[in-house]
């Protein structure tokens, strides 16, 4: 299954707030969940919705998500927590968290178009796994810096997680450590994703 490129508001209406997918929010009067789906939720449906939330928020394919679950399952710590740490340490997600991109798909595009450097080297793979003490910068050319400058200006500096720091004048971000569970910007029960 390929990456989702369809209407984003449909997914938000169905699954709830997904800040990584888009900044838009549905109208408060149009609550389609209650209209179509009343009654008892089955366990399978609950687990499927949690998995879909994770997939659409981080912009993953089904195969990528299964690979991350497999890697997290081999770890000795809690599988759900390791899964979220793996997903949060992706380069496209870190750019989104730093405020260098408005959404995760926007961050993917920045990385794919070779505007981003990690430790002084161009990285064009959005799923690149960042480590603590990685320095993320933009290229020195004007076009790359203007793209990031617009996003930084419109982002909220109070929402920056504790495991990241940003220098807005030099367009430079730093990964301090691996994040804690409480700083994940998505309301999700990761254990249901692992069970699915």
Swiss-Prot record:
In this protein, which residues make up the domain named S4 RNA-binding? 89-169
Show the disulfide pairing. Answer: none
Please give the InterPro entries that the UniProt record associates with this protein. Answer: Ribosomal_uS4 (IPR022801), Ribosomal_uS4_bac-type (IPR005709), Ribosomal_uS4_CS (IPR018079), Ribosomal_uS4_N (IPR001912), S4_RNA-bd (IPR002942), S4_RNA-bd_sf (IPR036986)
* Biological source species: Brachypodium pinnatum (Tor grass)
- According to the record, the signal peptide region is none
Q: How does it assemble?
A: Part of the 30S ribosomal subunit. Contacts protein S5. The interaction surface between S4 and S5 is involved in control of translational fidelity.
Which compartments is it annotated to reside in?
Answer: Plastid, Chloroplast
Which UniProt keywords are given for this protein, alphabetically ordered? Chloroplast, Plastid, Ribonucleoprotein, Ribosomal protein, RNA-binding, rRNA-binding
One GO term (biological process):
translation
Q: What does this protein do?
A: One of the primary rRNA binding proteins, it binds directly to 16S rRNA where it nucleates assembly of the body of the 30S subunit.
One Gene Ontology cellular component term attached to this UniProt record is:
small ribosomal subunit
Give the matching NCBIfam families: PRK05327.1, rpsD_bact
* UniProt-annotated stretches for the region Disordered: 16-36
Alphabetical list of PANTHER family matching this protein: 30S 40S RIBOSOMAL PROTEIN, SMALL RIBOSOMAL SUBUNIT PROTEIN US4M
Q: What Pfam families does the record point to? A: Ribosomal_S4 (PF00163), S4 (PF01479)
GO terms for molecular function, please? rRNA binding; structural constituent of ribosome
What is the protein name given in its UniProt record?
Small ribosomal subunit protein uS4c
Q: Which gene encodes it?
A: rps4
Query: Which CDD domains does the protein's record reference?
Result: S4
Family, as annotated: Belongs to the universal ribosomal protein uS4 family.
């Amino acid at each position: 299954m390929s990456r989702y490129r369809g209407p984003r508001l449909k997914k938000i209406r169905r699954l709830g707030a997904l800040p990584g997918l888009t900044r838009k929010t549905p109208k408060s009067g149009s609550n389609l969940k209650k209209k179509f789906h009343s009654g008892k939720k089955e366990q399978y449906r609950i687990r499927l919705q949690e998995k879909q939330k994770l997939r659409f928020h981080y912009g993953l394919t089904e195969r990528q998500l299964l690979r991350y679950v497999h890697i997290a399952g081999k770890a000795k710590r809690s599988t759900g927590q390791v899964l979220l740490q793996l997903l949060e340490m992706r380069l496209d997600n870190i750019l989104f968290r730093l405020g260098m991109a408005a959404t995760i798909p926007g961050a993917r595009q920045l990385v794919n178009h070779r505007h981003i450097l990690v430790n002084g080297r161009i990285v064009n793979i959005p799923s690149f796994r960042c480590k603590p003490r990685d320095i993320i910068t933009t290229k020195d050319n004007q076009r790359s810096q203007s793209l990031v400058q617009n996003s930084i200006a419109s982002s909220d500096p109070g929402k920056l997680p504790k495991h990241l720091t940003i220098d807005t004048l030099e367009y430079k971000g730093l990964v301090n450590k691996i994040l804690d569970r409480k700083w994940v910007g998505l309301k999700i029960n990761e254990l249901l994703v692992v069970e699915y």
